[in-house]
Amino acid sequence: PRGGVWCYAESDDGVVWNKPDLNLIEYGGSSQNNIYVLGQPQAYTPFIDPNEPDASRRFKSAVNSLRIDTALAHSPDGLRWTEYRDGAAITGRASDTISQVLWDSVARVYRLYTRTDYGTAETGEVRGTRDMVAAADADLSDPDSWTTVREWCLGWERGDDDYHRQRQLYSVNGWMYEGVQHALIWALETGEGETMNAYMATARDESPWNLEWIYGDQRLIARGEEGRFDCRWIQPAPNIVTWNDQHWLYYAGQARSHDGTWSPRLSGPGGGIGLARIRRDGFFSLSSGSGGGSITTRALRFEGQRLTINRTTRAKGSV
């Protein structure tokens, strides 16, 4: 059906997954399946809201519709969903990929990340993103509760209005970690055989995103070798799981480019779900090279007995 099928799975270790029969939705003549959404609305990105006192609205999610906009939904259990205001939109055009709402416990605001469109008849498709905030006690279903704090397209802050011809934003989702916003960026490489890649950016409060990693072509997850299920397409999940001193990021992979071209060397599944693991706090770093180097940090007001550094060195290296 238009909008697709959304399914539920659970796991004790994050690797081996169980797909329970939910008996919620009939599909193919049977309700013995793990489907929790069929058709519209679509693109659920659920989270548990610690700021919500109403148990029936404990889970929240941004959702998209065939109108190509973003609305919000709530649930008591993450499986049975009700749209706020019967699915009335809270944003404008072009939220047609993955939108996300989340709670920022440090700033004590809700944050909403959606795709948007800056294209004209002259430029054609130009995809960007908008980032919005709402107060802790706001009616999240009311568009007037939301304030836009960023609207941007790759290349704008560099004065390059044609950058979108080589790389476009498909979605930007937020992951809050240690009080810092981390953007999980899904991008179309229009100048590279229309492959899809994942990148990361950071921001504090409402300041602009630091995009140096995406401009430096430093992908968060490397695509697989040609012929593997993830050799042409990497789509990151909208959140990261941190446990056992690692960050786990699930992603959807395909051996198909955005233009529909399949890898000619495909020898196994054409798509699937992958898992990327990163050592704790290991997603960004400074590298000195073999010649050594030095850095000067901002002034730090330290209270405690022990200060540690997260570093990796070669066999004869030192700090």
Per-range role (PLM):
Residues 1-319:
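Carbohydrate-active catalytic/glycan-binding domains of CAZyme proteins
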